[in-house]
Amino acid sequence: MGDLENLLLEAAGRTNSAGRSRHPPSSRRREGSYSDGSSDSRDDSDEDRGYASRKPSGSQVPLKKRLEAEREDRAARVEGGYGDGPSDREGDSSEESDFGDDLYKNEEDRQKLAGMTEFQREMILSERADKKGDKNFTEKLRSKRESEKTPVSKKETQPLPASRGVRSSARSADRAAAKDDALNELRAKRMKQQDPAALRKLRDASKGGSGSRDFSSTKRKPLASSNLSSSSQSDSDSRSQSDDEGSNGGMLDSDDDRSDVPTFEDVKEVTIRRSKLAKWLMEPFFEELIVGCFVRVGIGRSKSGPIYRLCWVKNVDATDPDKTYKLENKTTHKYLNVVWGNETSAARWQMAMISDGHPLEEEYRQWIREVERTNGRMPTKQDISEKKEAIQRTNSFVYSAETVKQMLQEKKSASVRPMNVAAEKDRLRKELEIAQSKNDEAGVERIKSKIKQLDASRNKKGVDKKALKLAEMNKKNRAENFKNASEVKSITASLKAGEAGYDPFSRRWTRSSNYYNGKNKGKDGEENEAAVAAAVETNGADAGAGVEATEAALEAAAEAGKLIDTRAPIGQGAEHNQLHNFELSLSLTALQKYGGPQGVQKAFMARKQLTEATVGCRVAENDGKRHGLTLTVSDYKRRRGLL
């Protein structure tokens, strides 16, 4: 803070930063004063006035001359860009004097602001408060500067020799340049604290201004050395040399920024490949080391091949343990937030999408152009060298006991192996005994809750055991059904229990039949015939072999007192099929004169050609064949060019 106050006090004789930020035209006018033209005009004005900037006391100078001297002094300050005169404050006074301490002009202004949105009203009041604070700060600096002024004796009002005037002009120019450097340094410190990116832009934009200041300083140096004495010459030389160093500071800083951009080889050395990410995934230094490194992210494919972007790693995101993915032969829930250009383009990517190859120089140039286009953060060579050293230190990393314990815990949580509930429960019981011996109530409750969770997980597995067995059985049956459907084999349904090939779970064709028996022991033939006739009507069967067999079976069942159908019922459709079971000889030799199997296609093509020749209209190409609508895997790969 001491350096900042000294810089503020040193700059008090010129202007303040608040005024410069509020008035861009005046700031441009003051920046223009850094050039050699303004400095020469300031030197000439000092010579013409004969060192009149040192005014005598008001009691010794007549009123008319004192007023003229004040007007000349005010005009000189405006030309030199001092900005402390009344002309610089006219714009502020016209606005700042309109509102009072409550930041409102009048009741009409209060009602007008009340009708606005809260955001607009707060923005206007904030701007007024800033202007009022800047005005108070300016008045304090002006009053302090005026209080530090000392009355000048009458001897200093005498005309000075030409050499004295030139020396005073050179010294005043040196003082102005020193103030300019102090203000530039103060502005650079403030901008560095608030916005480093804006500071870099300001340095790049100030290359032209620094060059003009360099030229003006070299122009002042021979002027002073040619007219001053030997003692004053050495003094002015040292001051002009310091001015040269100060004026060259902006250009040197800008050149340093250009030379501080990391080269392709630097970026290549800190680019981490996918295999290295998989190796460092469970290491304790991974989340800290990977920040600031570069990775190649695969964003898609083109005709020429995959497309990669060279991105800078911002941080590691491991906030969602449920979203896991595979990386090499490991399972992880860690994602990388990477930046390409500006930090507003940060995106989360899986480490499985990172390339395992080295970056290309074209990708490096694309990244440089994107950073410059979006005004993003450019890592310096110092950052790259520090990251290289950090990567080298991983080879000699020393694992502490706490680190090893943490790594084991992470590997255990990331493991996909099923947990041994009995062993885990036994371990928790031992920990419970230790916690009870130490009277650790919190530890006891925590361990008991874990034991309850293990019991609940075991009960849940027991409930799901039956469902799992049924699911396995269904899966087995589906596989068997698919196998039977794909294989052509005869299924013998006439096998009985105990015979070879008999399957009790195989499906058989059945047909429902309704039986009834009014008298258990009745043997009257008429009643049996009536029962048979009723059964025949129910089944829709006619007289025949099937009906006789069914009648015999029913009669035998009635005599035994049982209602068991020993043979599959035969309906009218079955008998009709049996009647048409005979061989019919057909000959296709008569079709040979029409072209045989290809006759249909030939006839279609002939009719198509005749129609097109006669009508002159094209016939749709439909050859009458049914083409396959499916492709095999090999055909698909061949068409896609994968084979």
Curated annotation (Swiss-Prot):
Gene3D superfamilies (alphabetical): Plus-3 domain
Low complexity bias: start-end ranges: 162-171, 225-235
SUPFAM superfamilies found in the cross-reference section: Plus3-like
Keyword Cell membrane among record annotations: no
GO molecular function: DNA binding
Record-listed N-acetylglycine modification sites: G2
Assembly, per entry: Component of the nuclear PAF1 complex (PAF1C), which consists of VIP2/ELF7/PAF1, VIP3/SKI8/WDR61, VIP4/LEO1, VIP5/RTF1, VIP6/ELF8/CTR9 and CDC73.
PANTHER family registered for this protein in UniProt: RNA POLYMERASE-ASSOCIATED PROTEIN RTF1 HOMOLOG (PTHR13115:SF8)
Record protein name field: Protein RTF1 homolog
Organism listed in the record: Arabidopsis thaliana (Mouse-ear cress)
